Amino acid sequence: TAYYDAMIANWFNKKLKIEFPERKTIFGRKLQQLRYGENPHQQSSIYVNDYNDKHLKFDQIHGKELSYNNYNDMFASLEILNSLKKNSGTVIIKHANPCGVSENKVPLISFKNAYASDPISAFGGVIACNYKINKKIALEINKNFLEVILANGFDKDALNILKKKKNLRIIDISNFNLKNLSSIKTFDGSFLVQSKDNIVIDKKKLKCVTKLKPTKKELAEQTGRGRKSTTK
């Protein structure tokens, strides 16, 4: 009954566009019991909100069950991917931090450039692409060890190639939508809630207010908000 009442309350908040009500109920349905958390000694599960019809709209086509760290890296990759142009973006994540990001109207070049950014860190990482994976890209992917590949679809030849690696988790994100979600951080019975930082930056609308002007290379970077640290 409490679960049902909470769903009704959240539905009305959404309908009335009340993003931050005086009382907020956070609840979820267990989607999966995970083997362990960030470390082997930690327990972990993943939950989803039934009132949000856009939650985790992706399909796992192949591979082992997703782990806590897989999900964490996937979420980080999708947040950055959301800021890149459609059908051109590639993001590589390791330990929730980007180690390769690229945009190119030719998907194969986009993939190669992203991987070339830091091939050592990319080892055992997660790759997210907002384009469809074809045979040529699949052959490049299989040259490397990766935990997860997320993409906006896979053609038949690509799937046949990728499935040769039995442990590679293949995720179709064709129906995934990151917009209109909230970000929540918890600590000791309290939680911080904010709207998601999913604005796509329009360089034409940027205004420099300092004497030092950014270079074209600096403006091209889309990974700042995806980093856990800005130190080098």
Predicted regions and their residues:
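ATP-dependent carboxylate/acyl-activation modules
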Residues: 3-232
